[in-house]
């Protein structure tokens, strides 16, 4: 037992497993869960870069970031040097200009090293994409370059204390006075709140409903912008979560992204990609959990034999692997549909987010169970993957909302 504990303590087994995973496509043995299956050579190349970065820079630190609630700014900026700060932002403003499928491949790989940190990076990317896609040339060249290098960090501000799933009922107001908007209201559960430099804010410039919402960029340090206390969370502890508060906060009209009344459309377009991104983060957590369980079953002995000889546990592992691969296929199908702007892309993104976040959490939870008492210790990575992936069923549109969007597509006339 002492040897087993020392082998796993402080996530040492995780680092070794991820290093091995990063080298998988160079090996003669191909496992059925190989994440490079179906990818072209270029995609395999940047996937390996992401896996290597996850194993080298993230996995050795994920436990400390979680337990000390550290926001790993320096490591994220290293990720940005590899092009991960603006993965699907256009190249003329510093982005990598990659596809939605490419982005999913990268976020899955990074999430094996730290799911929480990768999830923040994915939100940051979504904000940069919104500005790149809907901003004018001046806005694109002002905001996107420092976001792509992660010199500056971004937060997405949609949810409010009184409007979660019913986002179109948001109350934060922006009243124009001359060449400024005066913002009043608050946003809740904002990832990066208080630490980010740029806040992409959905606020009400017109009447009630979705058509009265606009998108405005608020920069940190603007008078009237403040933040609530840092929330204590079950997971996602490597990224701070705070309320974002606006009290007579004057923001230049020039910071409005798109036209007045276009904000809800921008928000929903961003979330379609955000759902692929967060599902990919769940996929990375589940993939790492399967790898760790695979190793644990070979090493841990009970009743005089390795756990890997138990047919029941073999079947459990097989189910986990099957759910993992099915999730990956759904995510990648939806990513391609979104890239091609297919009419069913919203439903497919919703399906992928719904299925992958639920099944991948189930994989992480089962991995903890199969580690026995060790899985419940914070010295072992499986518990962190389970905690960090749980919230994915709630954010970027709850899975109940995903079911609404899917059924709406099916029942349309």
Curated annotation (Swiss-Prot):
**Is rRNA-binding included in the keywords of this UniProt record?**
no
Swiss-Prot/TrEMBL GO biological process terms:
lipid metabolic process; valine catabolic process
Report TM segments. none
> What Pfam families does UniProt report for this protein, alphabetically?
Acyl-CoA_dh_1, Acyl-CoA_dh_M, Acyl-CoA_dh_N
Kindly list any coiled-coil regions of this protein: none
Q: Which residues carry this modification: N6-acetyllysine?
A: 48, 229
SUPFAM superfamilies per the record? Acyl-CoA dehydrogenase C-terminal domain-like, Acyl-CoA dehydrogenase NM domain-like
Q: What is its EC number?
A: 1.3.8.5
Reaction equations catalysed: 2-methylpropanoyl-CoA + oxidized [electron-transfer flavoprotein] + H(+) = 2-methylpropenoyl-CoA + reduced [electron-transfer flavoprotein]; (2S)-2-methylbutanoyl-CoA + oxidized [electron-transfer flavoprotein] + H(+) = (2E)-2-methylbut-2-enoyl-CoA + reduced [electron-transfer flavoprotein]; propanoyl-CoA + oxidized [electron-transfer flavoprotein] + H(+) = acryloyl-CoA + reduced [electron-transfer flavoprotein]
Positions where N6-succinyllysine occurs in the chain: 48, 211, 269
Per the record, the pathway is:
Amino-acid degradation; L-valine degradation
GO CC, alphabetical: mitochondrion
Superkingdom of this entry's organism? Eukaryota
Active-site feature positions? 396 (proton acceptor)
- Stretch forming the transit peptide: 1-20
What is its biological role? Isobutyryl-CoA dehydrogenase which catalyzes the conversion of 2-methylpropanoyl-CoA to (2E)-2-methylpropenoyl-CoA in the valine catabolic pathway. To a lesser extent, also able to catalyze the oxidation of (2S)-2-methylbutanoyl-CoA.
Q: What is this protein called?
A: Isobutyryl-CoA dehydrogenase, mitochondrial
Please tell me the species this chain comes from: Mus musculus
**Gene that specifies this protein:** Acad8
